[in-house]
Swiss-Prot record:
It comes from the Bacteria. ATP binds at I18, G60, V61, G62, K63, T64, E65, D248, E313, R385. GO terms for molecular function: ATP binding; ATP hydrolysis activity; peptidase activity; proteasome-activating activity. This is ATP-dependent protease ATPase subunit HslU. It is found in: Cytoplasm. Belongs to the ClpX chaperone family. HslU subfamily. ATPase subunit of a proteasome-like degradation complex; this subunit has chaperone activity. The binding of ATP and its subsequent hydrolysis by HslU are essential for unfolding of protein substrates subsequently hydrolyzed by HslV. HslU recognizes the N-terminal part of its protein substrates and unfolds these before they are guided to HslV for hydrolysis. It comes from Rhizobium meliloti (strain 1021) (Ensifer meliloti). Its main location: cytoplasm.
């Protein structure tokens, strides 16, 4: 768990997301409170619950990106799910407890990668020995092995083809799940794990070059050095204490007064979410997982429904509300120029690979922002995603002809932008008259 201060968290988020200070402050405080909770004694720590957040704002203004960057910053298990993908228990579809199972799987991957990094040096040594075994055999004299080891380290044997044994992907299969009881499994029937341990696991022969074999063998050797049970325990603890769940499109399961039909199932999904958000225990194949301290961030545009249309009990479990504002022309301009991996920087780097130097004038950036604002106002407001449509249209010719223009420079000005997006604006005007 990172110990960034709220100010440092907001500063880090500012590198990738423009504006939305209220939302950034809310998630920064929530993350810092997790660190504060870890400093408490055990008795009080269990009593401190996370303050779940409800983000309200149109699409494309940064709701998902704020949550994703927050999880990356914290090094925490993170899952993003659409609330509309789930159905009430008893209906065909995924049940909400699958969210927690997915979170634990993400935790397993995070912990495994972390542990692999710790044993990488030892795994690399073991991988080198296996490459030497494949090159000279296991019975070669020490002098021969040392001679080949020097050549190996000097990259003289990189292109030589060898055959190595590696563990089959997925050979330590999970237990059989009981129909109708997701997450529960029958330990007695976990045959692949039993036989895998008894027989040393299933392997397959792979033909590859010496250079490419290292990636396979280092992973293989790393997994041999890891304790799977320890990884599972750590992953469950990480999911329980540091997990972040982003519930998108929560407004789509809000039932308006007088609604019938699908509203019944939507209300059922809300009722199924209640215990998950409040705190319950979910059965997974890695053991029971408590959701008491998982941070839930719900979001929705709420164009039709209102936050008050959610079940009162669910509203009470989302105590912190932040509204994200729609993006202005100045915001679009800053998105194009100030963010860490801005679109302009991305396109410049992509075309540099073809030897084309791309340059945008200040008035071109203004024109791009202006067009994006107009299209959002006239068609559908999709926020910052509109910039991708505009940029693709403006740079269509340059991207297509780039292989033939190596060594040349291309300057994009306001006139160039208007010339290339004029038909886009014309199509927009016509679209208003199409049913």
């Amino acid at each position: 768990m990172s110990n960034f201060s709220p100010r440092e968290i907001v500063s880090e988020l500012d590198r990738y997301i423009i504006g939305q200070k209220d939302a950034k402050r809310a998630v920064a405080i929530a993350l810092r409170n997790r660190w504060r909770r870890q400093q408490l004694d055990d008795e009080l720590r269990d009593e401190v619950m996370p303050k779940n957040i409800l983000m309200i704002g149109p699409t494309g203004v940064g709701k998902t990106e704020i949550s994703r960057r927050l999880a990356k910053l914290a090094g925490a298990p993170f899952v993003k799910v659409e609330a509309t993908k789930f159905t009430e228990v008893g209906y065909v579809g995924r049940d909400v407890e699958q969210i927690v199972r997915d979170l634990v799987e993400v935790g397993i991957s995070l912990v495994r990668e972390k542990r692999r990094a710790e044993v990488k040096a030892k795994a690399h040594q073991n991988a080198e020995e296996r490459v030497l075994d494949a090159l000279v055999g296991t019975t070669a004299s020490p002098a021969t092995r040392d001679s080949f080891r020097k050549k190996l380290r000097a990259n003289e044997l990189d292109d030589k083809e060898i055959e190595v044994d590696v563990a089959e992907a997925g050979s330590p299969g999970g237990a059989f799940e009981i129909p109708g009881m997701p997450g529960a499994n029958i330990g007695v029937l976990n045959l692949s794990e039993m036989f895998g341990k008894a027989l040393g696991g299933r392997t397959k022969k792979v033909k590859t070059t010496v250079k490419d074999s290292y990636a396979l063998l280092v992973n293989d050797e790393s997994d041999k050095l890891l304790d799977n049970e320890q990884i599972q325990r750590e992953a469950v603890a990480a999911a329980e204490n540091d997990g972040i769940v982003f519930l998108d499109e929560i407004d789509k399961i809000a039932t308006r007064e007088g609604g019938i039909g699908a509203g019944v199932s939507r209300e059922g999904v809300q009722r199924d979410l209640l215990p998950l958000v409040e705190g319950t225990t979910v059965a997974t194949k890695y053991g029971p997982v408590k959701t008491d301290h998982i941070l839930f961030i719900a979001s929705g545009a709420f164009h039709v429904a209102k936050p008050s249309d959610l079940l009162p009990e669910l509203q009470g479990r989302l105590p912190i509300r932040v509204e994200l504002r729609a993006l202005t022309k100045e915001d679009f301009r800053r998105i194009l120029t100030e963010t860490e991996a801005s679109l302009i920087r991305q396109y410049k780097a992509l075309l540099e690979t073809e030897g084309v130097a791309l340059d945008f004038t200040e008035d071109a950036i203004d024109a791009l922002a202006e067009v994006a604002v107009q299209l959002n106002a006239n068609v559908e407001n999709i926020g910052a995603r509109r910039l991708q449509t505009v940029m693709e249209r403006v740079l269509d010719d340059v991207s297509f002809n780039a292989p033939d223009r190596g060594g040349q420079g291309v300057t994009i000005d306001a006139e160039y932008v208007r010339r290339h997006v004029g038909d886009l604006a014309a199509n927009t005007d016509l679209s208003r008259y199409i049913l």
